[in-house]
């Protein structure tokens, strides 16, 4: 197959939110196969020569924030709001076409911008651009609007039905868990494939000890301090108060609770409440203030800053008490770094992940005495901890490795462009023993770009 130019589109590709992390993993796989990747968003930390920055595309742009304030939590919208939505849609549509033309894009990958309506004008502009240009598109869905209470009451149902997501013949839809697949089909009639979040389990992480030690000093950790790591953004659905409760019950001043990520898109009130809650319960809480970079981002812009790879080595235990997750990046990262963890039985975990056979400390919405006892047992027993983390790494290697992603992306590219490789093997998707058949069929002409 001839190398393709692939354009990633979202409101933001920056930092270590789940969408940005997964997009970089996809891009890494594509680049390994000789394809070129380019980036369109309202906030970017990618290679500037391969980026198309449009500030109006960011979900936190003032005009978009004003629109969201007018249409969510309300049942009617004014003509003024509609006019602004379409003005932004028109601008972004022009910018999208410029992006496609400048980098000669063959395939669009839309990361969550046709899924959750944080930026309605961007979703509308994407739907129209994809329909008019007929450009091959993968819509990668992380969390749908019907999964979030904040979007339940709205004044934009017409736009949601049109673009979140659109039903077009040149779009292949990808979801990250089975419930999303079923709900998407039930609500819209759209079929999809499941590609879970993955990590490179074929290659264990390489850690920079010097940078890791510098990070430890930067948050004033003493040599004998023990780190309970909460590797998530600070938003309500992460259930971080349960991590505070756990550290309190450990009753050992050496244990420090460290939150590695920044606040999310829901404001700072929850972070302020957590600080007060930890203080009231006598828990030493450290929120990392330094910007944490994405370890898969090869731009090098953050060479003087820390990545997740500098943080995980210091963790003695991981807390992941989320109420809801699309998949669970922190879970798979903890397994990758061979760290024991406490996880809440959120729906996707209970349905898609738990049956795989991981060895974890699991809570069911509340922190019981038995759960605290099991955490203490693991912290105090190196032998038990080693057995647990090795089991988890082996299980994850079978189900959540790059091999799974590599084969799925290759199959979709083949369907779009009718390249010379055809799958014949019935071996599991993560098997390296994929057999290909070379064909001499000429590929059809590429899509026609809109003028």
Locate predicted features.
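Conserved donor-binding/catalytic core segment of Leloir-type glycosyltransferases
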Residues: 216-217, 221-238, 244-247, 257-259
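A conserved catalytic-core segment of Leloir-type glycosyltransferases
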Residues: 2-3, 29-31, 36-107, 292-293
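Aromatic "clamp/platform" in nucleotide-sugar-dependent glycosyltransferases that forms part
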Residues: 323
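Nucleotide-activated donor-binding/catalytic signature segment of Leloir-type glycosyltransferases, i.e.
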Residues: 222, 268-310
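A charged, aromatic-enriched C-terminal amphipathic alpha-helix characteristic of glycosyltransferases
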Residues: 380-421, 436
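Donor nucleotide-sugar binding/catalytic pocket of nucleotide-sugar-dependent glycosyltransferases
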Residues: 146, 159-214
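N-terminal subdomain of nucleotide-sugar transferases
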Residues: 1-53, 135, 424-425, 430-451
């Amino acid at each position: 197959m001839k190398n393709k130019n692939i354009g990633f589109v979202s409101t933001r590709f920056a930092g270590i939110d789940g969408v940005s992390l997964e997009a970089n993993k996809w891009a890494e796989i594509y680049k390994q196969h000789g394809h070129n990747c380019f980036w369109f968003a309202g906030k970017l930390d990618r290679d500037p020569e391969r980026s198309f920055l449009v500030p109006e595309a960011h979900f936190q742009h003032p005009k978009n924030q004003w629109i969201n304030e007018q249409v969510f939590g309300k049942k009617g919208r004014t003509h003024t709001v509609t006019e602004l939505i379409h003005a932004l849609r028109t601008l972004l549509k022009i910018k999208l076409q410029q992006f496609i033309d400048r980098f000669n894009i063959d395939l669009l990958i839309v990361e969550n911008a046709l899924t959750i309506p944080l930026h309605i004008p961007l979703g509308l502009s994407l739907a129209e651009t994809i329909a008019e240009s007929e450009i091959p598109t993968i819509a990668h869905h992380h969390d749908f609007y019907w999964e979030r209470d904040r979007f339940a009451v709205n004044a934009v149902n017409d736009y949601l039905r049109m673009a979140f997501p659109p039903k077009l013949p040149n779009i292949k839809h990808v979801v990250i868990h089975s419930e999303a697949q079923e709900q998407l089909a039930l609500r819209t009639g759209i079929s999809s494939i499941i590609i879970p979040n993955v990590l490179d389990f074929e290659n264990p992480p390489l850690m920079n000890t010097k940078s890791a030690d510098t990070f430890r000093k930067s948050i004033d950790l003493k040599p004998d301090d023990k780190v309970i790591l909460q590797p998530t953004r600070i938003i309500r659905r992460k259930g971080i108060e349960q991590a505070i409760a756990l550290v309190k019950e450990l009753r050992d001043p050496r244990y420090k609770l460290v939150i590695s990520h920044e606040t999310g898109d829901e404001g700072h009130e929850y972070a302020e409440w957590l600080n007060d809650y930890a203080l009231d319960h006598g828990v030493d809480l450290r929120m990392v203030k330094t910007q944490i970079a994405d370890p898969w981002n090869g731009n090098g812009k953050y060479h003087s800053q820390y990545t997740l790879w500098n943080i995980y080595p210091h963790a003695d235990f991981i807390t992941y008490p989320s109420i809801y997750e699309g998949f669970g990046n922190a879970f798979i990262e903890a397994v990758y770094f061979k760290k024991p963890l406490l996880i809440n039985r959120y729906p996707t975990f209970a349905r898609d992940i738990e049956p795989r056979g991981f060895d974890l400390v699991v809570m069911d919405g509340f922190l019981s005495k038995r759960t605290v006892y099991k955490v203490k047992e693991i912290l105090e027993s190196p032998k038990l901890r080693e057995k647990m983390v090795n089991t988890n790494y082996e299980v994850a290697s079978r189900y959540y490795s790059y091999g799974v992603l590599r084969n799925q992306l290759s199959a979709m590219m083949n369907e779009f462009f009718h390249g010379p490789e055809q799958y014949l093997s019935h071996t599991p998707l993560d098997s390296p023993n994929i057999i290909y058949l070379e064909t001499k069929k000429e590929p059809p002409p590429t899509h026609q770009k809109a003028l």
